[in-house]
Amino acid sequence: MSPAAPSQRDRSVPAKAGAGARRTALAAALALALATASPQAFPQTPATRDALLAQARQQHGTGHRLEALAACEDLLRRWPADADALRLRVRLLAELGAAVRALELARQLPTPLPAPELARLEADAAAHQARWAQAMPADTRHPYVEADRALASPDPAAVDDAIAAADRMIALARASRSREAAGAYQALRRRGGTLPAYADTPVADALLQQRQPEQAIPLYEAASRAQPGPYPEEEADPRIGLAHAYLEAGRHRDAQQWIDRVAASEPAWLPAPGSVRPRANPHKTEAELTAALVRQQTWRYREAWRRLEALRAEGPANASIWNQLADTERARGWPRRAEDTLVGAAGLDPDDTSIRLGAIDTWRELGDFPRVEPALREVEAVVPRDPQVQLARQAWDRQRGWQFDLEHDRGRGGSPNFGDADHETQATLQSPLLGERWRIYGITRLAAANLPEGHTQRERLGLGLRGYARGFEAYVQALPAVGNQTRRTALEAGLRWLPDDYWTYTLDWSNTGDADVPLRAHYYDITAHSLNVSAQWRASERSAIKLSANADRYSDGNRRHGWEAAWTQRAYTAPWFSVDGGLQAGATSNSRSDVPYYSPSCARWIAATGRLENMLYERYERSWSHQLDLSFGSYDECRYGSGWMASAHYGQRWAPHAGLAFGWGIGWNSQPYDGKRDNRVMLDLTLHWGE
C-alpha cells in the first residue's frame, strides 16, 4: 500500500486576513491621523525649529514613532521646506508601515535619497503592496496584478543592501514568485549576506515551495526562536512551517514531536474584545491540522481521520478542517465520501483553491475524467503560479497521457503446469485519453516453458479499447496468434465497477483462457473459454473481504469450476510501516482428470497470509519501498490426501520521479501436485511509465 500523494498547504499564504487585516488598516489610518494631529495635542510643543526637530528625534530614538511623527508634521507646517524634517517624516512613515506613502514623499524630496536608501523604500513598499494583494486582492480573478505592479520597480539586487534585498524577497514570495525569491536568497548567501529576522519566515516559505526543505529549516528555526509566540491571527506561524519542512525533508519523527508540542502549547480559545464569548484560536487549529497531516503522510490514516473528525465536531464552520478531512478520506479509499465532504468545504469557502484541487483529485480517482480539464483550467486561469495547481496539472497530464507497462516473470522448478523453466512477458502501450473516455492500446504477450515433452511457447500481439465512466471501467481486446506454436485469435473483454466506496465488482472473459490454461495444456493445443468474476468489500485500508469464482470450458471437454475467499486485516501500523494478516480458502473441481495437464477432480486449500510493507525512502514523488508476503496452509487433493503448502515473496519498488516506477521481486512456492511436492522459485520485474 503506497501512501497518498502529499496535500500540503501553501506555506507562503498567511492565515485569512479578515478581521486581522482590517485591524492593520485601522492602525495605519490611526497613525496617519496622529501624524496630522494639531499641536494642541502636545501642550509643551517647542517654538523653535531646532527644538521641534530635537523633540522629534528624541521621540524617535525612544521608540515613540507616532509622537515623533506628530512633532515632525508640526515642524513642517511652520517650515514646509525643511530638508531634515522631510527626510525624518519619510523614515517614520516607513517604520510605521505606510511604506507606499513614504516612497511617494521620498520621490518628492528636493534632495534625492541615497540609492541604497531609496532601493530599500521601494522594496519595502513592494512587500507591503504584495501582502495586501495576497490577503485582499482588488480583483479575485486576477490576484497577481497588484503584486506584480508593486514589483515592477528596479531590482535592488545590484545595490549591496540586505534590507532592500530581503524586502524584495518577501514581495516575491507573497506574489507567488517563489522561484525568484529563492534565487535572490541564494544570491544573498553567496555575497555573504544574512537575512533580517523579519524576513526569515516568508523566505523559508518560498524555499519550501521550491522543494528546498533543508534550506528552509534553519530559517524557520531561527524565526521560531526569535518570536516563540503568540502570533497575530493574520500572521503565519513559523512553527507550522517548520513542521512541514521537517516532514518534507524526511524527518517525520522530528515533525511529529515538534507539531505535537506546538499544538499542546496553543490555547484552544482566545478572548474576544467586547464579547463574553471567546473566539477560536486559528493557530491552534492549524497546528492540529498539521499534526493530522504528519500522520496521514506516514500511513497512519485512521489516526489522522479520527483527529480530523474530532476537529470538525469542534469547529464545523472551518473550511480547512473539512478540506483536509476530505483528503484523508480519499487516502483511505473513500472518494465519494471525500467528494461530499468537499461540497461542505466549498460551501464554507467557495474561493479556496485547495478545495477545488481536492475535487479534481477525487474526479480523477473516480474516472470522472470529463469534469477534470474544465475545472483545472478554471483554477489555472486565476492562480497559475500556485505550486499545488502546477503539480495538479502535471499529475493530470501524466494520467491522461501515454501509459506503458512491462511485466516479466521467470520461474524454475518441477511443476507439472510450468515445467523445469518458464517465463512470461506482457507489455502494454496505451494512447492518451481520447474524448476524455477512451484509450486505444497495443498489447503483446510472450510465454514459454521447458516441459518434459519439449519446449512450448505462446505468443500474441494485438490491440484493445478501454473505456471509462464514473466508477466504471471496461475493455475489449483482440490478440492474434504470432508464430507457428500458437493457435486462434484471443478475444477478451472485462469490466470493473465501483458502485460506492466499499464494493468492487470485476468480470473477465476470454475465448482462449490464456490466464487460466497452463502452458502444458497449450503444448497439446488445448484452449478454454474462461470466465472470472469477483466481488470485494473493502471497509478501508485496514480490512477487506474478497470472493472470486471461475468457470473454464476446455476444448478437450474438461469443465473446471473454482472459488476462493480472502480476508485481510491490518494488524499493526507505524510510520511508513504496516503489517497485515489474513486468511485464504478455496476449492476447485474438474470434470476430467485424465488429461495431460494438472487437473485434480477436486482440491481444497486454506492458508494464513501475512504482509509487511515498509517505506525505505520518500522525497516528494521519489520513493523506495519494499514488501514481504508470506503464506502457510494446507492443500487437500482428492485421492492424494493433504499436505502443507507455503509461499514467500520479497519485492522492492523504486520510483525515481513522478510517473516512472521500477519493481523487482523474488518468490518461492512449495505445494503438492498429485501427491508429489513441487518447489518453484520465481523472479518478477515490472516497469511503469505514465501515472
Where are these regions (language model features)?
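Gram-negative and organellar
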Residues: T45-T48, A54-Q55, Q59, L88-Q108, ...
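N-terminal signal peptide c-region/cleavage motif recognized by signal peptidases
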Residues: T36-S38
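N-terminal secretory signal peptides that target proteins for export/translocation
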Residues: M1-G20
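N-terminal, post-signal-peptide region of Sec/Tat-exported proteins
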Residues: H64-G97
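Hydrophobic helical h-region of N-terminal Sec-dependent signal peptides
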Residues: L26-L34
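Hydrophobic alpha-helical segments, especially transmembrane helices
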Residues: R23-T24, V90
